[in-house]
């Protein structure tokens, strides 16, 4: 009784014709095979790219490693190694090849000309030395070294001249070490270093003992001493003035002090130069209020330190690891992908039991070098490294060390030598600055509490201040003034 009679269903083929599928696959197997091949090729390409980048990074690391001889005469002491022995051994096969490649690299035409001239000057210098004309010989040795600073023969002969004629065994040992770094099989440099290494190590240890004695003498002065308080205040200004000056800041000491005391701008100076000084002030206050009392220094502490250093100059990059590759003169720091691992290793070393056994000056200088070598930030690496160094020294009872901006070229030269394998000249440079800073404090708290020589910047100011001073020790005063004004000279 239905209103519509049931109709028979049409054949399946007819349904397909009437309602064709939107996308009908004729044969799914070739499409799957094509996708599989495409994924395989893409994966292989990605793996090859990763391997190439890793190999490039490995080459960088290998070229930064110190030589790994087993002989005592070529090694610096274990605490001076940037990488662990395990890391060095893991890379040794590749490292030996990279060293042989670099040693066998051909010289450019200009380098060949310089080497030829250097060797000629070297022969003339040796002849003059044998003839007893030491002054002329010294000048020719220096000329040869300037022309070919990494030629083993030049380093060896100049080192012998310094050792036997100038009685400068420390510098001679440094040149023997450099000669062996470039040419490990040099038998003459080897014999010379066997003779000098232990003597130089003994001299370095005696120097550190002397620094400890001066530190103890300074520690014996009560905190309530008025001269000590004034010395600390002026040293604070000096530290900031010289640290930003090393990086190119053109503020004078008087302008630096004015900014810190009044927070007023100085006419004719850029905003960045003002902000660099204010950032250092923030970082120093953070150290005094927090870091000096901490047992361990962490990555977070270093980032907080850097955040304050760049807080006014570049607040976005402050306290952040860099995200790009940077180049620092001839030094190529690690890529951004390696920073997290390298900083973790640095943190472990910084707080290790082994590091706690190092002399504070060695420890602080090494920490400075290791951090600036990693170069974890876009900007502010030098300032942050110097602040970390002084944090470690202050925890050991030393005052913050002042590296005069006039010695900027020496400072960078010794960092370059450390990159080439010998960190001892840099450690000695920091020890020298430490001693001069200690001498300044001891001098300021002895017979002239009313005047701190670090304040003086110009010859006219120096003459005016000297006229006001009544102490009989004029030679000592002049020596201190010379160091802090010219960046050279030795304190008595």
Swiss-Prot record:
Enzyme Commission code(s) on record: 2.7.7.108, 3.1.4.-
GO molecular function, one term: ATP binding
Compartments where found: Membrane
Null mutant phenotype: No visible phenotype. Flies are viable.
Residue numbers marked as site, Important for autoinhibition of adenylyltransferase activity: 247
Catalytic activity line of the entry: L-tyrosyl-[protein] + ATP = O-(5'-adenylyl)-L-tyrosyl-[protein] + diphosphate; L-threonyl-[protein] + ATP = 3-O-(5'-adenylyl)-L-threonyl-[protein] + diphosphate; 3-O-(5'-adenylyl)-L-threonyl-[protein] + H2O = L-threonyl-[protein] + AMP + H(+)
UniProt protein name: Protein adenylyltransferase Fic
């Amino acid at each position: 009784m239905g209103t519509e009679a049931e109709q028979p269903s049409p054949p399946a083929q007819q349904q397909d014709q009437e309602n064709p599928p939107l996308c009908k696959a004729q044969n799914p197997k070739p499409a799957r095979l094509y996708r599989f091949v495409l994924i395989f090729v893409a994966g292989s390409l990605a793996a090859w790219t990763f391997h190439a980048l890793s190999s490039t990074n490995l080459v960088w690391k290998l070229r930064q490693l110190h030589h790994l001889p087993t002989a005592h005469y070529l090694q610096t002491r274990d605490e001076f190694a940037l990488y662990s022995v395990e890391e060095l051994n893991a890379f040794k096969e590749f490292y030996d090849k990279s060293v042989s490649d670099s040693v066998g690299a051909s010289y450019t035409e200009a380098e060949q000309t310089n080497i030829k001239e250097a060797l000629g000057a070297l022969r003339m210098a040796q002849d003059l030395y044998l003839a007893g004309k030491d002054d002329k010989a010294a000048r020719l040795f220096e000329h040869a070294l300037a022309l070919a600073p990494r030629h083993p023969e030049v380093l060896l002969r100049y080192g012998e001249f310094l050792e036997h004629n100038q009685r400068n065994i420390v510098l001679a040992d440094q040149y023997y070490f450099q000669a062996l770094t470039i040419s490990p099989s040099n038998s003459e440099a080897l014999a010379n270093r066997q003779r000098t290494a232990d003597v130089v190590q003994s001299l370095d240890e005696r120097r550190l003992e002397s620094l400890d004695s001066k530190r103890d003498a300074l520690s014996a002065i009560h905190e309530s001493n008025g001269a000590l308080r004034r010395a600390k205040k002026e040293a604070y200004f000096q530290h900031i003035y010289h640290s930003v000056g090393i990086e190119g800041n053109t503020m004078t000491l008087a302008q630096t002090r004015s900014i810190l005391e009044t927070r007023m701008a100085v006419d004719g100076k850029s905003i960045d130069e003002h902000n660099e000084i204010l950032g250092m002030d923030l970082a120093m206050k953070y150290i005094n209020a927090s870091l000096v009392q901490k047992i361990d220094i962490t990555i977070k502490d270093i980032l907080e330190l850097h955040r304050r250093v760049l807080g006014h100059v570049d607040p976005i990059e402050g306290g952040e690891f860099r995200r790009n590759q940077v180049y620092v003169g001839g030094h190529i720091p690690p890529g951004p992908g390696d920073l997290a691992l390298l900083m973790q290793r640095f943190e472990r070393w910084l707080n290790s039991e082994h590091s706690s056994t190092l002399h504070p000056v060695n420890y602080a200088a090494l920490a400075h070098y290791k951090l600036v070598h990693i170069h974890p930030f876009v900007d502010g690496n030098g300032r942050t490294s110097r602040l970390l160094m002084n944090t470690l020294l202050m925890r050991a009872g030393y005052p913050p060390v002042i590296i005069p901006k006039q010695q900027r070229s020496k400072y960078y030269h010794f960092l370059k030598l450390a990159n080439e394998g010998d960190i001892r000249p840099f450690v000695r440079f920091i020890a020298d600055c430490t001693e001069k800073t200690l001498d300044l404090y001891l001098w300021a708290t002895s017979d002239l509490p009313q005047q701190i020589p670090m304040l003086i910047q110009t010859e006219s100011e120096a003459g005016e201040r000297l006229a006001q001073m009544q102490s009989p020790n004029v030679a000592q005063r002049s020596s201190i003034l010379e160091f802090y004004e010219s960046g050279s000279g030795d304190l008595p």
